[in-house]
């Protein structure tokens, strides 16, 4: 008797959208990560020499609105398995900033050549996570509509100081009609690990913003006559304090071009 055995083909499942994004950036693709890999948490990067890690950790504890820690590496390791099994901090961000003595000296798409054995990576929550919740409620988000980076501004809101780290909070801005602004407060309050509720609504000059059409980071977006600007604490704040602290060396992401993780946005909600 002849027994025919059907060949079984094992299909390799498609990688997660978050991993697909990281692989694309690892391969050299560059662009804003707003709206990329819907449903997955994105993070801001602050990579510092170990001698400054304790003080920066304390700075984040004192300033949880702009600096909510969602991941931290071991000294010298470019991997944070809790955020992605194959994630490589050195290659998986669209664009980085390399800092020396508080100034940006390079903006590469790969920092392998800059990597050192004494570096510690902090990954901080990003407002792109709560944007998904806003979109699910049918609320328009201007910078996504216009395919530009979210506008970000240095303010006169002082951060708590820790070691060499001190300076003003950076905020991101999204314009909404007043009723939608109230709803945005309610929705984003559920996401304290990704900046939570806004820190300010309305009059930009009250928090030290002289011209809303000229953001310090990102791209300007129009605010209609029937809208108000709504400001959230922003994970670019560490870049402002790194500049002020004049650290001899540091690496961050380029504003608006984040680390895409395998964490789910829904896990960031508290209620």
Swiss-Prot record:
> The organism sits in which domain of life?
Bacteria
Extract the InterPro entries matched here: D-Glu_cyclase, Putative_hydro-lyase, UPF0317
Q: What residue stretch is flagged as signal peptide?
A: none
Keyword list, A-Z: Lyase
Extract one GO molecular function annotation from the record. Answer: lyase activity
Q: Nuclease: is it a keyword of this entry?
A: no
- Annotated SUPFAM superfamilies: PSTPO5379-like
Q: What class of enzyme is it?
A: lyase
Enzyme Commission code: 4.2.1.-
Q: Does the keyword Aminoacyl-tRNA synthetase apply?
A: no
Query: Which HAMAP family does the entry mention?
Result: Hydro_lyase
In terms of PANTHER family, this protein maps to: D-GLUTAMATE CYCLASE, MITOCHONDRIAL
The record's family statement is: Belongs to the D-glutamate cyclase family.
Task: Name the chain's protein.
Answer: Putative hydro-lyase blr2921
Task: Tell me what organism the protein belongs to.
Answer: Bradyrhizobium diazoefficiens (strain JCM 10833 / BCRC 13528 / IAM 13628 / NBRC 14792 / USDA 110)
């Amino acid at each position: 008797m002849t027994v025919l055995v059907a060949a079984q083909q094992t299909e390799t499942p498609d990688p997660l959208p978050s991993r697909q994004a990281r692989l694309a950036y690892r391969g050299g693709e560059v662009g804003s990560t707003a709206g990329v890999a819907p449903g997955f948490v994105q993070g801001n990067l602050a990579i510092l020499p170990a001698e400054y890690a304790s003080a920066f950790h304390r700075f984040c504890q004192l300033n949880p609105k702009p600096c909510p820690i969602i991941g931290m590496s071991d000294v010298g390791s470019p991997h944070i398995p809790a955020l992605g099994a194959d994630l490589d901090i050195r290659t998986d961000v669209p664009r980085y900033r390399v800092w020396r003595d508080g100034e940006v000296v390079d903006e590469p798409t790969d920092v392998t050549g800059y990597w050192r054995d004494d570096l510690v990576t902090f990954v901080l929550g990003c407002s792109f996570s709560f944007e998904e919740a806003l979109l699910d409620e049918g609320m328009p988000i201007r910078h996504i509509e216009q395919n530009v980076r979210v506008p970000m501004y240095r303010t006169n809101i002082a951060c708590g100081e820790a070691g060499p780290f001190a300076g003003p909070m950076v905020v991101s801005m999204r314009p909404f009609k007043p009723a939608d602004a109230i709803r945005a407060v309610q929705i984003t309050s559920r996401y304290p690990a990704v900046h939570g509720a806004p820190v300010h609504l309305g009059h930009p000059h009250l928090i030290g913003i002289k011209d809303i059409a000229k953001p310090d980071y990102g791209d300007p977006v129009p605010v209609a006559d029937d809208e108000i600007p709504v400001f959230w604490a922003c994970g670019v704040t560490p870049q402002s304090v790194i500049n002020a602290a004049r650290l001899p060396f540091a690496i961050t992401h380029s504003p608006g071009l984040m680390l895409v993780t395998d964490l789910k946005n829904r896990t960031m909600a508290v209620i």
